[in-house]
UniProtKB/Swiss-Prot annotation:
GO terms for cellular component: ribonucleoprotein complex; ribosome. Binds directly to 23S ribosomal RNA and is necessary for the in vitro assembly process of the 50S ribosomal subunit. It is not involved in the protein synthesizing functions of that subunit. It holds the Pfam family Ribosomal_L20. The gene is rplT. This is Large ribosomal subunit protein bL20. The keyword Hydrolase does not apply. Keywords: Ribonucleoprotein, Ribosomal protein, RNA-binding, rRNA-binding. The keyword RNA-binding applies. It comes from Flavobacterium psychrophilum (strain ATCC 49511 / DSM 21280 / CIP 103535 / JIP02/86). InterPro entries: Ribosomal_bL20, RIBOSOMAL_L20_CS, Ribosomal_protein_bL20_C. GO terms for biological process: ribosomal large subunit assembly; translation.
């Protein structure tokens, strides 16, 4: 009995991977075995960095809030503690935006929690 092969599915599978490898440098973009490994590694990096991205943005927001709070002589931890105590339900993203782009509004919040 002859060996059963499914060339249509094989071609589709390879075509999908090669399409994902488009834009890669050197043999990574046009040699099947190299492209397959490159795409697999890229997917691992993409998965990891979707998590890292969230961490980085949170750290950025904290730095911005800290900078805004220190202009008024208060540390980040003191400020956030007082914000929670006064039941101000603004998250770090919004507070960071206020500190950077709307300093008057941020100062109002600071004065409210002092």
């Amino acid at each position: 009995m002859p060996r059963s092969v499914n060339s249509v599915a094989k071609r589709a599978r390879r075509k999908k991977i090669m399409k994902q490898a488009k834009g890669f440098f050197g043999r990574r973009k046009n040699v099947w075995t190299v492209a397959k490994n490159a795409v697999e590694k890229a997917m691992c990096y993409a998965y990891r960095d979707r998590k890292v991205n969230k961490r980085n943005f949170r750290a950025l927001w904290i730095q911005r809030i800290n900078a805004g709070a220190r202009l008024e002589g208060m540390s980040y931890s003191q400020f956030m503690g007082k914000v929670k105590k006064h039941n101000i339900e603004l998250n770090r993203k919004v507070l960071a935006d206020l500190a950077m782009n709307h300093p008057v509004a941020f100062k109002t919040i600071l004065n409210k929690v002092k």
